[in-house]
Amino acid sequence: MNFDCQAEHRLNQQGTVTPSESLPVPRPLPRHGNGFRTLINGLIFLGVLALSCLVLNRRLPYPDIPTAGEKIRYLTLHGREYDTLFTGSSRVNFQILPSIFDQTLAAQHKRSKSFNAGILGMRPPEQGFYLEQVLRQPHDRLRWVFIELTSLEARTPKSRTGSARFAYWHDAARMGLLWTWCQGEWAALRTASGAGQPSSMEERWEPLSVWLGHVPPFLRRSVNLGRASYLAEQWVLSAPERAKQRNKWRALGKDRDGWMPSGSPEVMNAQDRAAYQESYEARLAQPARHFHDPGSDAAAQAMLEAVTHSGATPIFFVPPMTSEKIYYPPAELAGRMIIWDFSDPRRYPELFEARNHLDPIHLNTAGSELFTRILAQQFAEFSQ
């Protein structure tokens, strides 16, 4: 009896033992794979995002960039009608008249229907991107593509860097061209250093800072930022109504062949005439100095390959101008290209008469008509 009382007393002192207290509580295992799984999930997300952007980019039409977008849309509808295209800057847009080009060839019993796809201020890398978009449009009859030969412009003026036009051409291929240009700038600095002209840190940083300035528009273009409005238009407007609103054809000229007059005064004022005369006499005394660089060379080669791959023949040309320096490819590349140089005032004196110029690098309407006839005549002789 005493034994039972003592046992009961000990149990009361220890308290009641529940099943949960009688078993050890398992500790959670350390989650060593969290960082790896996060990385994998992040990569999957980026991959899906990139694929979605790529599919959407192919689904969306050419951006509605002034002049460029309109010419692309017009070629989408009428590209099969043309056998000859002209591409380049204002020295194409305002200086080559397809109507006169075709008439000059017709007088020599050669059929031609040409279109001026030039755009004000267009230079590589933008020129190559735009050319590739032109060549993606229907072009069953296309045989010849005239391309203005000019250098790559990497240092874009700040006044243009915030525009939609600046952003639209920044794809991976163009970023590659800009990187080639950057490497060329560094190589030039190393060459100068080897010749006793050491470069500063600021000079070495500048090419990279220029390239980095092109990264934001590349990213905006890659994710199709700001282009959802087109998809909204598709849901709200019928195809005919959408075409009616977008296709005004204001940039195509009265003949809808892509040529328009520049709108500048047709005659130089006294100050401009004096400046032109000075540059003209300098070119008579000494021809323009040719230069080339890796970025411009790569851009020219890419355009050469793009046109050749499309089944057409590229003809590069240098317009009539009195600039001190003119881009011209190195001999190895130039040997694979057709290049017509109209920048020599001794060979083409009529193209350099002051009455035919707006300024040292642009012709007026009369000069443009003359240049178009000379271009067509040379083409007629070449294509015999």
Model-derived segments and spans:
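N-terminal Lys/Arg-rich, disordered targeting/topogenic segments
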Residues: 1-36
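Hydrophobic membrane-insertion alpha-helices, especially the h-region
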Residues: 37-58
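Active-site segments of SGNH/GDSL-like serine hydrolases
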Residues: 301-327
